[in-house]
C-alpha cells in the first residue's frame, strides 16, 4: 500500500462494531468487567483506550513498527523512551537538539544519574569519538531543529549497532510521509504529533513506535506507569489530521522551497538553511534518505540585531512557538524554542541570536513572499 493510501486506510481506520468510517471517540475512563479479570481488552483508559489504540496502530503502520504509543506531548513520549535507560548510562545528543529535549535531559534526567555528550551528530567521526563504555543510546534529529542538519541514518545506526547502542530518531520535521527511520536501521522513532501530523495547531500530542518487540513491551510499561497518555479527543483529532498529511506536506514543501530560493537571493540574508536547496551541504544525502524536504527552514540576517524587528514586522507569518500547522509561523530559536540552552553552547552550535526559523504554511506562496518583502523593507 502506498503512503498516500496508508495515511487514510492504515492502522484501524473504522469502527468494527458499527461500521463507522471514522473511529469513534470513546470518552470513558473505565470499562465494565464481566468478572474479576474478565474484560473485553480494556480496563482503564490510562492503560488503554480504543480511540488511542487506533492512533497507535496507525503510527506503527506508517513507520513500519510493531507497536505504537500515543502520549500527551512529544516530550512525554521522549521521557518514556529515555526511561529505558539505567542510572549511570550515557547518551549522545545533537548540538542543535530541540530545546525541550535538552531541558528534559539537562534538568530532569540528570537527577537519575544519566549523562549526555553534545556533538554534531551529522558528523559520523564525532559520534565514533564520543562513544564511551557506558554509552547506551544515540539520539538523532534529522532534519535537525533549527539548523536543518541531515544525519546519515543508515551509517549512524550501523555504528550504534556495532557498539550496542539504541538509535532513537525524532522524525517530527520529516514525518513518515518523507522519511522512515526504522527502515534505515533505527530502533525507536518519536514524533511531536502536535506539529505536521496534527497539522492544524489544535492538538498537543506525542507518538512513539519501534520495530523491536522487547522494546515495545518496555515502552508500554513506562507509558502506563508514568501515565502521560493521550486522551481520546486528542487521539481522534490527530487521526483526522494524519489523513490529509500527504496533501499538506506537498504544499508545505512547495512553498518552503519557494521561500528558501527567495531568501537565498535577498541582499539582507546571510545564509539559508534548507535541505531542499542544492547549496545545502547535505542536499544529496537528504535526496537519498528522504522522499522530500518538508516545510521547515531557518536563515540568518547579515545584521543579527535586526532579527527581532524583522519577525515582529511580519503579518502572515505568525510570531509564535511550535510548527507544522497549515498557517505559517516564525520564531527566533535563541529567544524562544532553544532559550533554555546556555548562550555559549547555542552559539557554538550555530544558533545565533539572529537566526530566524520559519514554519512555512500552505498559503499562496506569493502572499508569503510579499509578507517577507514588506518586513525586509521595515528593517531598511
How would you name each of these model-derived features?
Residues 1-42, 49:
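N-terminal glycine-rich, Lys/His-bearing helix-loop that initiates the first secondary-structure elements
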Residues 3-21, 305-345:
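C-terminal core of ALDH-fold dehydrogenases
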Residues 115, 129, 133-136, 248, ...:
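PLP-dependent enzyme catalytic core of the Aspartate aminotransferase-like
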Residues 238-247, 294-302, 357-361:
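Short, well-ordered beta-strand elements within core beta-sheets of diverse protein domains
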Amino acid at each position: 500500500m502506498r503512503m498516500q493510501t496508508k495515511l487514510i486506510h492504515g492502522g484501524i481506520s473504522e469502527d468494527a462494531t458499527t461500521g463507522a468510517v471514522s473511529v469513534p471517540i470513546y470518552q470513558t475512563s473505565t470499562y465494565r468487567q464481566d468478572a474479576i479479570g474478565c474484560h473485553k481488552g480494556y480496563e482503564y483508559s490510562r492503560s488503554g483506550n480504543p480511540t488511542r489504540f487506533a492512533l497507535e496502530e496507525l503510527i506503527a503502520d506508517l513507520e513500519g513498527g510493531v507497536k505504537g504509543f500515543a502520549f500527551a506531548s512529544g516530550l512525554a513520549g521522549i521521557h518514556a523512551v529515555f526511561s529505558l535507560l539505567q542510572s549511570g548510562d550515557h547518551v549522545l545528543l545533537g548540538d542543535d537538539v530541540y530545546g525541550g529535549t535538552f531541558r528534559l535531559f539537562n534538568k530532569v534526567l540528570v537527577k537519575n544519574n544519566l549523562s549526555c555528550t553534545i556533538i554534531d551528530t551529522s558528523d559520523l567521526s564525532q559520534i565514533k569519538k564520543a562513544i564511551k563504555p557506558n554509552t547506551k543510546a544515540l539520539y538523532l534529529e534529522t532534519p535537525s531543529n533549527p539548523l536543518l542538519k541531515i544525519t546519515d541514518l543508515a551509517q549512524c545506526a550501523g555504528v550504534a549497532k556495532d557498539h550496542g547502542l539504541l538509535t532513537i530518531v525524532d522524525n517530527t520535521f520529516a514525518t513518515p510521509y518523507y522519511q522512515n527511520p526504522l527502515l534505515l536501521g533505527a530502533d525507536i522513532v518519536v514524533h511531536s504529533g502536535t506539529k505536521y501530523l496534527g497539522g492544524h495547531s489544535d492538538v498537543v500530542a506525542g507518538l512513539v513506535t519501534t520495530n523491536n518487540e522487547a522494546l515495545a513491551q518496555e515502552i508500554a510499561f513506562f507509558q502506563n506507569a508514568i501515565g502521560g497518555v493521550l486522551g481520546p479527543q486528542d487521539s481522534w483529532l490527530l487521526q483526522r489530521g494524519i489523513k490529509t498529511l500527504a496533501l499538506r506536506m506537498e504544499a508545505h514543501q512547495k512553498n518552503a522551497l519557494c521561500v528558501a530560493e527567495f531568501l537565498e537571493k535577498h541582499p539582507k540574508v546571510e545564509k539559508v538553511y534548507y535541505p531542499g536547496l542544492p547549496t545545502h551541504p547535505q542536499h544529496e544525502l537528504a535526496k537519498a534518505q528522504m522522499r522530500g524536504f518538508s516545510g521547515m527552514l531557518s536563515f540568518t540576517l547579515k545584521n543579527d540585531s535586526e532579527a527581532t524587528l524583522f519577525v515582529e514586522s511580519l503579518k502572515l507569518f505568525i510570531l509564535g512557538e511550535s510548527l507544522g500547522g497549515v498557517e505559517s509561523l516564525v520564531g527566533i530559536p535563541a529567544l524562544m524554542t532553544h532559550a533554555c540552552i546556555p548562550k555559549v553552547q547555542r552559539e557554538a552550535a550555530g544558533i545565533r541570536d539572529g537566526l530566524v526559523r520559519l514554519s512555512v504554511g500552505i498559503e499562496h506562496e506569493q502572499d508569503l513572499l510579499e509578507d517577507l518583502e514588506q518586513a525586509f523593507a521595515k528593517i531598511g
